[in-house]
Amino acid sequence: TSTRIALASAAQCSLDAADAAIGLLQAAGLQVSRLADIPGLAVMRTVAMLANEAADAVYQGVCSAQAADAAMRLGVNYPKGPLAWADSVGLQNIHTVLRHLGCSYGEDRYRVSPLIQQQVFAGKPLHG
């Protein structure tokens, strides 16, 4: 179980309200990281981008899904590979984050990998 939570306040949220929410969460024993209210926040945008790049490598025949995950687990000491992470947080969530990032920033780097699109539309995970 995590003891850290991220909190992003919308523009219409007062500083007093945000501080009160942080105080409540801290009283419940959670450590709070205050983040800017931007698309994807910090963790999901990073996980989504890693998963998207790994999915593109699989789609282009560079490696298998298992090999991509093993490379990241063993090569950079991630607790899970990016595709396993995508499956555990929900491939539909990854798809949605990438689409929102693409709409918000208009940059091609947020283009959803065809493999992720195929699997989401088929209702299937990347592994399995």
Model-identified regions with their sequence ranges:
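NAD(P)-dependent Rossmann-like dehydrogenase/reductase catalytic/cofactor-binding core
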Residues: 1-128
